[in-house]
């Protein structure tokens, strides 16, 4: 037995340090709910989790982008629906006005309402916007003809959706079923029977054009909706993978904390006894 160096005490102190460290780590994991709280816990795991968190954050942003794109297209579609309803009323007026039994005085009433509806068509086309992006008017210089939606967390992964130029139907030309062309809806009239007949045919083409435009918007909304589901599923899977690496097993950590707590208490008791060994040797020598 040696007196100058208390080997048992030194070993017990080291065990006490390790047991206290294990108990502290278990307590930290229980408090945070995470198995990895620093690179010391698992450097490789932390690197993987960081990459996964970056990816899931990007996917969540892409989901919001697509949802905003759907909102934008729904705004445009709603406006086109209003324009279609207006055109249907205009067609009704044109059909009524084409009746030869009406006098010019009778047609003045139709003309007044018909003209106000033309102005409302322009108003809808001019003012429909989403976040200051004009959705139905491509006549201005620099006007947007399509919107680009960032579809995923990868750079330049874009979904391009063409916008419908409803304003172009106002001053442009309309090709009728007969192959002839007439001016846009702003030039239509129900002032007499002939112009009313022509307006009826032109409005049919306008309604058909708007229906085609709505179909394109609907296709865009459908694609964006599927993209939302896709990126959401990817995000959920990525978060689940990160969780399996990063999150703590609470039951296991509680068991670890209890184990190290008992070992720490035992180490303290053993250290107290180990520190008394030199005194016991001295008493033995003196006796």
Curated annotation (Swiss-Prot):
It holds the Pfam family Flagellin_N. It is found in: Secreted; Bacterial flagellum. One of its GO terms (molecular function) is structural molecule activity. Keywords: Bacterial flagellum, Secreted. One of its GO terms (cellular component) is extracellular region. The keyword Secreted applies. The keyword tRNA processing does not apply. Its main location: secreted. SUPFAM superfamilies: Phase 1 flagellin. Belongs to the bacterial flagellin family. NCBIfam families: PRK12805.1. Flagellin is the subunit protein which polymerizes to form the filaments of bacterial flagella. This is Flagellin. It comes from Listeria monocytogenes serovar 1/2a (strain ATCC BAA-679 / EGD-e). The gene is flaA.
């Amino acid at each position: 037995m040696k007196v100058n160096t208390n080997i048992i005490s030194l070993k017990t102190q080291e065990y006490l340090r390790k047991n206290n460290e294990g108990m502290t780590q278990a307590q930290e994991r229980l408090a945070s709910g995470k198995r990895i709280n620093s690179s010391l816990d698992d450097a490789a795991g932390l690197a993987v989790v960081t990459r996964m968190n970056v990816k899931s954050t990007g996917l969540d942003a892409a989901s919001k982008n697509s949802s905003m794109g759907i909102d934008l297209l729904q705004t445009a579609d709603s406006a086109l629906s209003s324009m279609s309803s207006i055109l249907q009323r205009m067609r009704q007026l044109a059909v009524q006005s084409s009746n030869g039994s009406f006098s010019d005085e009778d047609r003045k009433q139709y003309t007044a309402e018909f003209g106000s509806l033309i102005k409302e068509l322009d108003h809808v086309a001019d003012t429909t916007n989403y976040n200051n992006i004009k959705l139905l008017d491509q006549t201005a210089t620099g006007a947007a003809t399509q919107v680009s939606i960032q579809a995923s967390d990868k750079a330049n992964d874009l979904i391009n959706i063409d916008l419908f130029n409803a304003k172009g139907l106002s001053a442009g030309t309309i090709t009728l079923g007969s192959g002839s062309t007439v001016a846009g809806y702003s030039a239509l009239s129900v002032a007499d029977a002939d112009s009313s007949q022509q307006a009826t045919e032109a409005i049919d083409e306008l309604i058909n054009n708007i229906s085609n435009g709505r179909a394109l918007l609907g296709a865009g909304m459908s694609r964006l909706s599927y993209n939302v589901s896709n990126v959401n599923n990817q995000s959920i899977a990525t978060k689940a993978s990160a969780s399996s690496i990063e999150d703590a097993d609470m039951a296991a950590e509680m068991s670890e904390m209890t184990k190290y707590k008992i070992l720490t208490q035992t180490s303290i008791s053993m250290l107290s006894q180990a520190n008394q060994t030199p005194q016991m040797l001295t008493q033995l020598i003196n006796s």
